[in-house]
């Protein structure tokens, strides 16, 4: 099993670029930078895309330009065009249930109230069996404050932790293609930015 599509979830536009909800896009942006493969807007895929080679495999990068709750439109368009199965997709997203400085990989599961994941599951024919990179952003402590929290910018101290976790996640993603998922997961799950 190889990953053929790596997606970073986000809301479009400058006003959202630095918000916690865009952590997935920060990850894909970093990966594109590390692999010297600048993202370019591609209208038919409703997002910014790039093609990279990882471990000898052709992999597409995607940051949708739809709003978060319509992310599935971009993912489904690209998956359908390149005949990519759900289990060949890695979706990077912000995760309330993990603290800043931590990132974890998992396959399948629910959407945990995340509107981007919810739409992707729906547009992939109600198939939740894609890989996720969960990037910890922490939780405001009160579920009524979640919307304001994810659409807010993290303080500098938290941003530093999130950036370090994303950096490690990028290294581990590259490792996945050379050394396998188990090794990459073990390394990433042992990491916690200080």
Curated annotation (Swiss-Prot):
It catalyses: an N-acyl-L-alpha-aminoacyl-tRNA + H2O = an N-acyl-L-amino acid + a tRNA + H(+). Keywords: Cytoplasm, Hydrolase, RNA-binding, tRNA-binding. The active site is at 21 (proton acceptor). PROSITE patterns: PEPT_TRNA_HYDROL_1 (PS01195), PEPT_TRNA_HYDROL_2 (PS01196). The record marks 11 as: Discriminates between blocked and unblocked aminoacyl-tRNA. TRNA binds at residues 16, 67, 69, 115. InterPro entries: Pept_tRNA_hydro, Pept_tRNA_hydro_CS, Pept_tRNA_hydro_sf. It is found in: Cytoplasm. GO terms for cellular component: cytoplasm. It holds the Pfam family Pept_tRNA_hydro. GO terms for molecular function: peptidyl-tRNA hydrolase activity; tRNA binding. It is an enzyme of class 3 (hydrolase). Its main location: cytoplasm. The record marks 94 as: Stabilizes the basic form of H active site to accept a proton. Its EC number is 3.1.1.29. One of its GO terms (biological process) is protein quality control for misfolded or incompletely synthesized proteins. The keyword Acetylation does not apply. NCBIfam families: pth. Hydrolyzes ribosome-free peptidyl-tRNAs (with 1 or more amino acids incorporated), which drop off the ribosome during protein synthesis, or as a result of ribosome stalling. Catalyzes the release of premature peptidyl moieties from peptidyl-tRNA molecules trapped in stalled 50S ribosomal subunits, and thus maintains levels of free tRNAs and 50S ribosomes. This is Peptidyl-tRNA hydrolase. It comes from Shigella boydii serotype 18 (strain CDC 3083-94 / BS512). The lineage of its organism: Bacteria, Pseudomonadati, Pseudomonadota, Gammaproteobacteria, Enterobacterales.
